[in-house]
From Swiss-Prot:
This is Collagen alpha-1(VIII) chain. Residues 101-435, 478-584 are annotated as: Disordered. The gene is COL8A1. Residues 168-190, 478-506, 540-556 have a biased composition (Low complexity). It comes from Oryctolagus cuniculus. Pfam families: C1q (PF00386), Collagen (PF01391). Macromolecular component of the subendothelium. Major component of the Descemet's membrane (basement membrane) of corneal endothelial cells. Also a component of the endothelia of blood vessels. Necessary for migration and proliferation of vascular smooth muscle cells and thus, has a potential role in the maintenance of vessel wall integrity and structure, in particular in atherogenesis. Vastatin, the C-terminal fragment comprising the NC1 domain, inhibits aortic endothelial cell proliferation and causes cell apoptosis. 4 consecutive G-P-P tripeptides are present at the C-terminus of the triple-helical region. These may provide high thermal stability of this region. It is found in: Secreted, Extracellular space, Extracellular matrix, Basement membrane. Residues 1-27 form the signal peptide. Homotrimers, or heterotrimers in association with alpha 2(VIII) type collagens. Four homotrimers can form a tetrahedron stabilized by central interacting C-terminal NC1 trimers. PANTHER family: COLLAGEN IV NC1 DOMAIN-CONTAINING PROTEIN, EMILIN ELASTIN MICROFIBRIL INTERFACE-LOCATED PROTEIN ELASTIN MICROFIBRIL INTERFACER. GO terms for biological process: angiogenesis; cell adhesion. Residues 572-744 are annotated as: Nonhelical region (NC1).
């Protein structure tokens, strides 16, 4: 049976009940009941006619404390005789037609005007925006999955930083502990006699009668040399002497070393070429990390990072709308956000060098390095602690006679004493009375030359003398003015590569360098740490791998036991023995005079008993720096010495095979200028001079071709103490070489 449709009132009631029981769900979130703000009832103009439905008015049925809730925009339905205004999802409820017919009022029933519902008015303008509400509680989002580490970037390539400023000199350290008392010193040498004292005052004149003249006495013993007399008047110019013939005297013995002079003033800073770069030293141990440096200046703001994907929707119940509060205080600093993408490289920072860091711990002692070259002479050190008193020295030279004392009382006659040593001559007394003429004395020694007298008158021009022998080399003169630049010489041959220098001390740590440009993306990083997981199922055995690389050679094994003796071999056939290495054939071709070279110089025997024709040649090195002056330099380390013609004990080459020889020497200069000469039979044939520059090691060379006869001697020698800075060391060699070019 069909159910007839109910009246419109029943439909509205059912619709109201169904809507009141619905809970609004948006995006999976549940919204509870909220109190609605009071709404202004819609204004209904009375002139608009409305239909009056039949039946009784349906009173308002509240379903909650404050009315029906359909959302935030739901108006509140008041009690009254009118129908509630029910919005349906932002749409107004359309009047329900009655089967396509309009409602007709019944007879006898009046419809009050207040119950008539007018048409919906136009939508009003939006109201002003309310004040912002208080900040909500921070959401608690689920942290995202940790991303995989990115690939390792390429190592940046930056320019090396500028060298740091030299650090300030450190403060003077605490005085060291008192050293142990040194060994007792030896008795010192006899001191230098003191200066002669001033003459004493004249004695009081004696009181006595003059005696008669005595008999002439015997001639006295030879007196001591009298004091130096005053210079006499210039004598007349004597006749011109004959030409003298004298041999140069032997060089005197080297005197005792003088006292250390005060340190000289600091010289100007030298300007020289930098030395050859030494090999890098061994890598030191890893130092402890230094203290964190000061933060650098803030760089420019980087490019904002790419916006991340929206997070998962939060789960929570919406609270009730509160009354808009007053603007709150500024919120605290939020948590640090995720790091953005790296920005472009900033401008190079210009910062001051930081303060020197604290002194680090003392590192592990390194391997002792090779012996360095001899350093320059240091300043005179502070006087040391006084040693224990030494033994009494030898009696010194008697000093000069002191001034006479006052006349004392006559004492008792003493016993005869031991005859003392002869005293020094007393001061010159006043002239006495004229004595009798004595006998002529013995001829005295020649006195010292007097002070140079006044120049005498210019004498007549003498005859031209014979040409004298060349004199000894004089003391080098002062440095002359700088000469004009000479003509550039031909380019010399390239010398042999030098020996690598000793590794210098490490310089101070410089300030941090300017950051280099951004490097290219690096290669994939090393594999991460092994994860912690359950062991998987054992896989199948794979194919055998390729054979590995050949390992390092093992240590040689112990020698095995000797084997049994072998069978005797066949008889040997001795081939003719060639000349040993370093020997030359006797027939050396024509000499300078066109005659075949003689064979009389093959007196030595070779290794196999035959004659050995060894070339006269040698090269010797100097092992100790600063050899003595005025004597042949002893190059005592031999590299080669054919026929043993060079003597390393004396430093002299003695010719045995006459001929034309070539000699060369290479010396180093350090600590002072150097002046060397090549001598042939005590006559210098070539000089070489080099000026020393402080802080640099210089070199000088020389060579000569000499014609030698048997017995001629050739050697090197330094003629002056003022230029004796010849240096040699473990890795700095001074050498002397010579060899026969062609025999005579």
């Amino acid at each position: 049976m069909a159910v007839p449709p109910g009246p419109p009132q029943l439909l509205q009631v059912l619709l109201t009940i169904s809507l009141g029981s619905i809970r609004l769900i948006q995006a999976g979130a549940y919204y509870g009941i909220k109190p609605l703000p009071p709404q202004i009832p819609p204004q209904m103009p009375p002139q608009i006619p409305q239909y009056q439905p039949l039946g009784q008015q349906v009173p308002h049925m509240p379903l909650a404390k404050d009315g029906l809730t359909m959302g935030k925009e739901m108006p509140h339905a008041q009690y009254g005789k009118e129908y509630p205004h029910l919005p349906q999802y932002m749409k107004e409820v359309q009047p329900v037609p009655r089967m396509g017919k309009e409602a007709v009022p019944k007879k006898g029933k009046e419809i009050p005007l207040a119950s008539l519902r007018g048409e919906q008015g136009p939508r009003g303008e939006p109201g002003p925006r309310g004040p912002p509400g208080p900040p909500g509680l921070p959401g608690q989002g689920i942290p995202g999955i940790k991303g995989k580490p990115g690939p390792q970037g390429y190592p940046g390539v930056g320019k090396p930083g500028m060298p740091g400023m030299p650090g300030k000199p450190g403060a003077m350290g605490m005085p060291g502990a008192k050293g142990e008392i040194g060994p007792k010193g030896e008795i010192g040498p006899m001191g230098i006699p003191g200066p002669q004292g001033p003459p004493g005052p004249h004695g009081l004149p004696g009181i006595g009668k003059p005696g008669g003249p005595g008999l002439p006495g015997q001639p006295g013993a030879k007196g001591d040399r009298g004091p130096k007399g005053p210079p006499g008047p210039p004598g007349l110019q004597g006749p011109k002497g004959e030409k003298g013939f004298g041999m140069p005297g032997l060089p005197g013995l080297k005197g005792p070393p003088g006292m250390h002079g005060p340190p000289g003033p600091v010289g100007l800073p030298g300007v020289g070429k930098p030395g050859v770069t030494g090999f890098p030293g061994p890598q030191g141990p890893l130092g402890k990390p230094g203290p964190p440096g000061e933060p650098g200046p803030q760089g420019p703001i980087g490019v904002p990072g790419v916006q991340g994907p929206p997070g998962l929707p939060g789960v929570g119940k919406p609270g009730q709308d509160g009354i808009p509060g007053q603007p709150g205080f500024p919120g605290g600093k939020g948590e640090q956000g995720l790091p953005g993408l790296p920005g472009p490289p900033g401008l190079p920072g210009v910062g001051k060098p930081g303060f020197p860091g604290p002194k680090g711990d003392r590192g592990i002692g390194g391997v002792p390095g090779a012996l360095g070259p001899r350093g320059e002479k240091g300043p005179v050190g502070a006087p040391g602690m006084g040693g224990p008193p030494g033994e009494p020295g030898l009696p010194g030279i008697p000093g000069p006679m002191g001034p006479p004392g006052a006349i004392g009382f006559p004492g008792p006659k003493g016993e005869g004493g031991i005859v003392g040593p002869q005293g020094p001559p007393g001061p010159k007394g006043e002239p006495g009375l004229q004595g009798f003429p004595g006998k002529p004395g013995f001829l005295g020694e020649v006195g010292p030359p007097g002070i140079r007298g006044l120049p005498g008158p210019i004498g007549p021009k003498g005859e031209a003398g014979h040409k004298g022998l060349p004199g000894l080399p004089g003391v080098p003169g002062l440095l002359g003015p700088k000469g004009e630049p000479g003509i550039p010489g031909d380019q010399g041959l390239q010398g042999p590569p030098g020996i690598p220098g000793i590794t210098g001390p490490s310089g101070p740590i410089g300030p941090p360098g300017i950051p280099g440009p951004k490097g290219e993306p690096g290669l994939p990083g090393p594999p991460g740490f092994p994860g912690v997981g359950k062991p998987g199922v054992a896989g199948l055995h794979g194919p055998p791998g390729k054979p590995g690389a050949l390992g390092p050679q093992g240590q040689p094994g112990l020698p095995g036991p000797p084997g049994p003796p072998g069978p005797p071999g066949p008889p040997a056939v001795m081939p003719p023995t060639p000349a040993p290495q370093g020997e030359y054939l006797p027939d050396m071709g024509l000499g300078i005079d066109g005659v075949k070279t003689p064979h009389a110089y093959a007196a030595k025997k070779g290794k196999n008993g035959g004659p050995a024709y060894e070339m006269p040649a040698f090269t010797a090195e100097l092992t100790a720096p600063f050899p003595p002056v005025g004597a042949p330099i002893k190059f005592d380390r031999l590299l080669y010495n054919g026929r043993q013609n060079y003597n390393p004990q004396t430093g002299i080459f003695t010719c045995e095979v006459p001929g034309v020889y070539y000699f060369a020497y290479h010396v180093h200069c350090k600590g002072g200028n150097v002046w060397v000469a090549l001598f042939k039979n005590n006559e210098p044939v070539m000089y070489t001079y080099d000026e020393y520059k402080k802080g640099f090691l210089d070199q000088a060379s020389g060579s000569a071709v000499l014609l030698l006869r048997p017995g001629d001697r050739v050697f090197l020698q330094m003629p002056s103490e003022q230029a004796a800075g010849l240096y040699a060391g473990q890795y700095v060699h001074s050498s002397f070489s010579g060899y026969l070019l062609y025999p005579m």
